[in-house]
Structures are given as structure tokens and as C-alpha cells.
Amino acid sequence: MQTDKEKSLLRRLPWLQTLLASLVCILLGLLVGYIALLIINPAGANEAFLSIIKNFWSYSKPEKQLKNLGVTLVITAPLVMCSLSVLFAYKVGLFNIGAAGQYVAGAGACLYCALALKLPWIVCLLAAILAGALLGVISGAMKAYRNVNEVISCIMLNWIMLYLVNTVLATVKNPTGKDTYTLASRNPGAILPTVGLNDLFGQKNMTIAVPLAVVMCVVIWVFLSKTRLGYELRATGLNRNAARYCGMRDRFNMILTMGIAGGLAGMGAAFMFLSDFEQWAVTQASVPAMGFNGIAAAFLGGLNPIGAIFSSYFIQHISRGGGHLNMNMYSPQISDLILAVIIYMCGFVLFMKKFMNTQRGTGRKSRKGGRDQ
């Protein structure tokens, strides 16, 4: 009984450890951003900082607030999917830095199906998922059969997919610019259904992508926590040799994991581009940041599918908030600085949790030693 009483709140509630560690990362990022604002222009630092935090609340009219909230939610949905891709693989002991390339593959597949083949949205969505999954399977197979580090193979595939997609989508580029055609102008049937969300938020790009992203978070949580296959995948990640000894198909599990992770990232690309919110620039020379930001969102959310919803929204909220700064005094890149610090600190989330457990463990040993004396 005495041992139970000595258990700390932090040790009994692991989610609280994750929450506290994530909050520390967020607060440090906000602090650095505020200091940068003070250095640039102390007089307007407080107002500028509040503008970043408030984001759409900076508008006085409710309809403007709702519309800009819709924009934030639209760009949150693909980030949620990319963070799910990263955390799903991480739960199985793999670091899916290839979420960026899988996102690119999904973007290329859905846009080509929509603009070149004039297919309906459901087919374009499935094409994006399959393209991302295929890229993930390639990395998983290289890891399973040739023991090629997934980080190396994923990074190489990221760049291969970028230039491949640029080449393919050049066939559906608008001649007046560097971007692909809008779906509304060429194939409105490829746009995801809005089911009234566009009217509710006053934002035409508000589609089923947002609720679907939330549903996928719940599905992944249930799959990893409550199903036999999810248990096998996690067991393979914890100890591949032990899993094989227990009769689990370790190679198949690794390939399946990367395939599912790739499919999630590909779905994220479909959520972005099939909402017709953004077009693909066929001349871009760098991989879109969405996939890499998914890494930050995954760790900031404590590698929990439900936490990924809130961390992804926070990242996009701060990113959009930078657009409300007074451009004569500050650069909107201040919000990027805040996010950069938060992303950097995300690497310490697991370290902070381990530190909390170590400290509590040391404290109990000291008290036990005192009683023995």
C-alpha cells in the first residue's frame, strides 16, 4: 500500500508527462519568438506577439473569423495525415523521414488522375494513397531484405519523386504560369465533397478532408492499441528478433508498416490538392515542407494519434498567425522562427519524459535507503 501512495501523478499518468514536455517545447518557442520581436522593435512587440497567437481572432467580424478558421483547418488536415505517417512508423521502430516524398507521390498521382485523366475524386484519392503506399513499400522492402537504413532510402526517394512528379505534372501545367491547372477549371468532379462545410465556414476549400483526418486519427489509435495486427507491428518494432522467434513475420510487418505510413502521407497530399486549395508548382526545386513538419507534429503530439490533431493545428495556427503582423515593422517569418525552435525542441520531448521518470525513480530509491538505515 505504501508503494502505491508513493507513486507520483506523473508516473501514473504518462499522458501528463507527454503534455508537460510538449508544453515546455511550445513555451520555449514562443519565448524565443517574443525575444526576437523585442530585438527588432520593442515598441510593438506585445501587439505583434498577440497577433501571432490570436491568428483569425485578429478579425473583428465573426464571419471573417470563421472563414480564416476554415483556412487554418484546411491546411491542418494534410499535416495531421503526415504526422500520422511518421508516428505510425515510429511506433513500429522505423523513422519515416520519407513522409515528404510519399506526400509528393500522392500529390502527383491525384493531380494527374484529376487533370489528365479527368477521374472522379474518389479514384484520385485512392490513387494518392496507393502512390504513397508504393513508395513506402519500396523503403520497407529495402530495410527488410537488404537491411538498408530507412532514413537513407527515404531521403533518396524523396528527391527522386520530386523531380519525377515535376516532369509528369508538367503535362497539365497552366501555360500562363508555373502551376498546374485548378481543379475547378478543368475537373470540378475531382474536388472532395464539401457536405455543407464550405457554407458553414464561408470557405470554398473546406471539404470532408478535415473530418476524415480526425477519423483517421481514431482509426490508427484503435488499430495500434486494440488489434492483434497492431500488437504484432509494435512487437516487431520493439525487438525484431524476439518477434521472429515468437512466429511473427518480421519482414512482412516492416514492409506493411512502411506501406501504411506511405499511404497516410499520400492521403494527406490528396486532402490538400483535392480541396483545390493549392496547385503544384512544376518548377519547385525542394520537397514540400508538409512532410517534414509532420515529424514535428508527431513528436509534439507525444507520438499519439489523438495528440497529433492538436499539435498539427497548433503548428498551422502559429504559421497562419504570422500573416497578421504589421509588415512595416516585422517580417511574417517570425512565426517560422517560433515553429523552428519548437520543432528543434521536439527532439527533446522523449528526453524530458525519460528525465521525469529518472528523477522520480531516484527519489524513491533515496527514500527507501533512508528507511533502511
Task: Set out the residue ranges of the language-model regions.
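Short loop segments and helix-boundary regions at transmembrane helix junctions
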Residues: L10-L20, Y90-I97, A116-W121, L125-N187, ...
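Transmembrane helix-bundle core of multi-pass membrane transporters
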Residues: N55, E150, C154, N158-K226, ...
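Transmembrane alpha-helical segments in multi-pass inner-membrane proteins
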Residues: G259, L264-A265, A269-A340
